[in-house]
Regions:
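Non-heme Fe(II) oxygenase catalytic core, chiefly the N-lobe of the double-stranded beta-helix
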Residues: 39, 71, 80-135
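Eukaryotic charged/polar low-complexity linker/IDR segments
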Residues: 140-142
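Catalytic core of Fe(II)/2-oxoglutarate
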Residues: 118-119, 126-137, 146-244
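Proline-centered turn/helix-capping motifs that create local helix->coil transitions or kinks
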Residues: 42-43, 99-102, 147-151
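N- or domain-start disorder-to-order transition segments that initiate the globular core
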Residues: 1-8
């Protein structure tokens, strides 16, 4: 399956952690097809996350809905299956220069994502351990599908430094942009503000290596955030999946 545009543009950022931004990533016909097949908001297969955490309103993420890969059909299912394959994972290995990457057959953190107007996801570092395989969550991959995105739509992917004192980059979620980043305990990122419907597909790539036991994201507070964000983030790391 050939889905990658031969003329993509790759930018690598090394600080505060390795991030690869690839514009014009998908072949134009592939991109057009996915735009056409994107599920409407009235589709019954969308599911939300936790409204409450330990009896408190979830102030970590709201307005973010996911569509399970197992509920997709036809070309969309073929596309999603392929990006988890070892063949495609090897292509990502070539782009990033990281060897011995393994496709995530469990699809644990994968899916079609839409964030609705007014939604947000607080800053966090991703899960580290894939429980099904025992492998390390090495890379997180996202492709954006936001046609006609404008600055005033917000929905920026914020990148924060290791000690959470500075937002070092704000990446625009323009259509056909792929973002890949290297996971660590301090690969802090989030989407604190969404002012227009925001669409993406996300999945993870694994690797063998030393890793802790944390299999959930760990949310942290920005300097301007309510300190309860960090406190609730620790509780959220212990909550079972809302949908699996």
């Amino acid at each position: 399956m050939n889905i990658v545009n031969d003329n993509y543009d790759l930018l690598e950022m090394k600080q505060p952690y390795p991030i690869w931004i690839i514009d014009n990533f998908l072949d134009e016909e592939v991109l057009k097809t996915i735009h056409e097949l994107w599920p409407g908001l009235d589709d019954q297969n969308w599911h939300g996350g936790h409204e409450m955490i330990d009896g408190e309103k979830n102030i970590l993420e709201q307005g973010m809905i996911s569509y399970d890969i197992n509920d997709t059909k036809g070309y969309l299912n073929e596309f999603l299956t392929y990006i988890h394959s070892q063949d495609f994972t090897d292509k990502i290995s070539q782009m990033t220069g990281i060897d011995n990457l393994v496709g995530d057959e469990s699809m644990r953190w994968s899916g079609i994502r839409t964030m609705v107007t007014g939604g947000f996801q607080a800053v966090h570092s991703d899960a580290r351990l894939n429980p099904e395989s025992g492998l390390r969550k090495e890379l997180t991959c996202l492709i954006y599908f936001n046609e006609d995105w404008k600055q005033e739509d917000s929905g920026f992917f914020e990148v924060w430094n290791d000690d959470m004192t500075e937002c070092t980059n704000s990446i625009s979620p323009i259509s056909n942009r792929m973002v890949i980043f290297l996971n660590s305990d301090t690969s802090y990122h989030g989407v604190p503000e969404v002012l227009s419907e925001r669409k993406s597909i996300t999945w993870s790539i694994l690797k063998s290596g030393e890793v802790g036991e944390r299999s959930k994201a760990l949310f942290v507070s920005r300097p301007q955030d309510d300190k309860r964000v960090g406190e609730l983030g620790k509780k959220r790391a212990l909550v079972k999946d809302a949908h699996k």
